[in-house]
Amino acid sequence: ILKKSDVVDAGALGFVLIIQGWLNSFQKSTKIQSHHLNISYEHSKIEALKKDIDFTITNKFCTECSIVGSNINRLELKEMVKNLGDSMVVAGTKDRVKIHIHTNTPAKLYKICSIYGKVVDRKVDDMTKQEHTVHHTGSSGISIVVDSGADIPEDYIDDIEVVPVRYSFGNQQHIDKVTQTSENFYKQMAIDSNHPKTSQPTPGDFSKIYNFISSHYDSIVSIHLSKKISGTYQSGVNAAKKIKVKNIEIIDSYNASVGLGLLAMYAVDLRRDGKSFNQIISMVKEKRDKTHVFLVLDDLKYIVKGGRLPAKIKTIADLFRLRPVIGTKNEGQLKARGVLWGRSNMESKFANFLGSKINNNFNYRIMIAHANSLKKGNRLLELLLKKHTNIKEHYLVELGGALGAHSGPQALSIGIQEIN
């Protein structure tokens, strides 16, 4: 039946072709040429087949981890996690168990696993992003990449590939914005004696993303945290040297958080408008000088614990009831950009401070990020929109762990970008 239907066992055929190639090489001392293989296919048929296949993904994240413990009850563990998703595999010994599952709630999985021992080797892949990359449509062969130090609204997240930043509370490891919600991150930060420590993506993390993208796109524009804040940019540069792709550019954003997010969104807009690879690079680099991020903290103890501020500065600020405004300056260096006096009405005082940064002769796109302080974020947005009619686009998002590890709960960050 298979022969009549012109169906071939692809694996077996591939093995036969390998053997044939070896024989030709040994017997004739000739290099194997692709035309010897006599393989062809009709591209239109492949594309038609892809359209006929249902790629609906019920559970978004391909999630893996290992549990290191003693006397791990694998049957009980299976019962605990089986309702979290599908494609579940639980295997190992009583001292070490490996889990694979497709789920929408990696954080729940890891929380259950922590009951049985130390959770290590965490890995989470967003399958919807992978599907979007594989089946992207349109004339653009340009992929936009950021690290998770960028805070980005839902409207844009599907159009951007993200290399994750990791953080840990003591021995408890997390993947930023994946294995723990921002809300739970700030709740834990407020009560955990272990201050969260962030770790930049490694060149290996970048290589994994770049290699996958390069099989589906011709060009990559990768925009990252300021190199004066993090080594993330350099990791991207190192990984890019080993990637086989037609065009790749690693850009220092001079920014963080929502500032970096705004630049990534701008790059997506340019791609949608049909701009070329070189045009996107040039225009993003020009726009980064017109994109600024500002951050006001509710409590300076977190930035002191994170090593970004001397303890004596906190002592002085607390004594005089001051709240410094921190922002990027000098091509991405975090610096004090101003001071808010008093502890009350932070949003109103911050809005007044930002008024001096918004020029009435230009239009703006802004994005506010809140650290488990949605009410404050909405209030700040309301004040700015009321006062500045030249704010043409606005977004409100949660502040991720990359910057939140230093800002602490109740902080507010804003990105301001001049637009045409």
Model-derived regions: residue spans:
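Glycine/charged-rich beta-loop-alpha catalytic/anionic-binding loops adjacent to active sites
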Residues: 188-192, 217-222, 241-253, 396
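Charge-rich, low-aromatic oligomerization/scaffolding segments with amphipathic character
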Residues: 105-122
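A generic structural motif
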Residues: 95-103
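N-terminal glycine-rich anion-binding loop in soluble enzyme alpha/beta folds
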Residues: 143-205
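N-terminal accessory regions of nucleic-acid-interacting proteins
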Residues: 120-126, 130, 134
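Active-site cofactor/cluster-binding pocket
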Residues: 201-236, 240
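Short beta-strand segments
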Residues: 18-19, 146, 222-226, 252, ...
